[in-house]
Amino acid sequence: MAAALRSAGVLLRDRLLYGGSRACQPRRCQSGAATAAAATETAQRARSPKPQAQPGNRKPRTGILMLNMGGPETVEEVQDFLQRLFLDQDLMTLPVQDKLGPFIAKRRTPKIQEQYRRIGGGSPIKMWTSKQGEGMVKLLDELSPHTAPHKYYIGFRYVHPLTEEAIEEMERDGLERAVAFTQYPQYSCSTTGSSLNAIYRYYNEVGRKPTMKWSTIDRWPTHPLLIQCFADHILKELDHFPPEKRREVVILFSAHSLPMSVVNRGDPYPQEVGATVQRVMDKLGYSNPYRLVWQSKVGPMPWLGPQTDEAIKGLCKRGRKNILLVPIAFTSDHIETLYELDIEYSQVLASECGLENIRRAESLNGNPLFSKALADLVHSHLQSKERCSTQLTLSCPLCVNPTCRETKSFFTSQQL
């Protein structure tokens, strides 16, 4: 057990944070008062009310389950969030996980709580997901009256409302159609795959078939409106750099990294993130030098690289001191944008390296065009009569998780 604890402590140190605003100001330009005000605003936004019922209390016909990992809204929720995360075998496998997971969660809680305090006391991801869902279903009712009324549901893996709780609410509402809509544009077995597995497990464990017809939007890395949103936010942020420096700004597209052991099993995530980056740069006319980098590496084992912080250091050493960070795999702000990118990299690391200007492109958050993208994705999906993407039907060539096969069978067997 001691050896297992030491091993897990190394593998899971410091940055395994999953949770979802503003762009960072140039280095050393934001005052302490401004930082405190921003943190207070983030805390207020994080403690948002639950999603409202369908307007007019009309019985919903089509439900859209918005899938994500979620994030603690208060520091008091951090330990439960971490415990669920460390117990998720779709995300990671540990020795004696039922004992080791809670142990690590308890040990990590104080440090992670302090990081959430630094961003205002909680994650705003639920608030942003609610706003995005509201905008999406409003547009859907206009775009697709024959599948209306539409209602969105939030299904988080590690905080309330949990995926299982959302499914129970959907069953009570008596829906005809249910769309499992991942909020990760790029598919990974550890994110979207874990959420889809949770849907299969729910029905398998309760021992009954769904009363509604399920399908899933399991990836959307190159949707035109998603690409337009990213391009718009990049252009907006580039305008804040000094005019004489603008063309030499290095754009660093930062995505959550993955262990190479997962990648080598055939997880499609790296290719799909790369596809998003290429489409965005094509939209921008390749106006600036750019790289795809990876953040949040944990432990000594090989992960996708280069790491975001190492890339920043390397560029600075080579005289490239104007950098724009773009969170390309996150659509809403959370701990990895607000703390890791905005504080660890844009404040602490930037000061250590001597960067001239570093900014972070705003997350998609409440952008109306992003709500339009979500509505268009669901509308097109409902019209297509597809159960899932063709890619979802293909298991990773070296898959080691038998639940994945059962989940794929669950969705492909639905009679729409």
Swiss-Prot record:
Protein name: Ferrochelatase, mitochondrial
GO BP terms, alphabetized: heme biosynthetic process
MF term (GO), any: metal ion binding
Pathway involvement of the protein, from the record: Porphyrin-containing compound metabolism; protoheme biosynthesis; protoheme from protoporphyrin-IX: step 1/1
Gene for this chain: FECH
Residues annotated with N6-succinyllysine modification: 131, 283, 408
Active site: 223, 376
Modified residues (N6-acetyllysine): 50, 283, 408
Function: Catalyzes the ferrous insertion into protoporphyrin IX and participates in the terminal step in the heme biosynthetic pathway.
Keyword terms of this UniProt record: 2Fe-2S, Acetylation, Heme biosynthesis, Iron, Iron-sulfur, Lyase, Membrane, Metal-binding, Mitochondrion, Mitochondrion inner membrane, Porphyrin biosynthesis, Transit peptide
Domain of life: Eukaryota
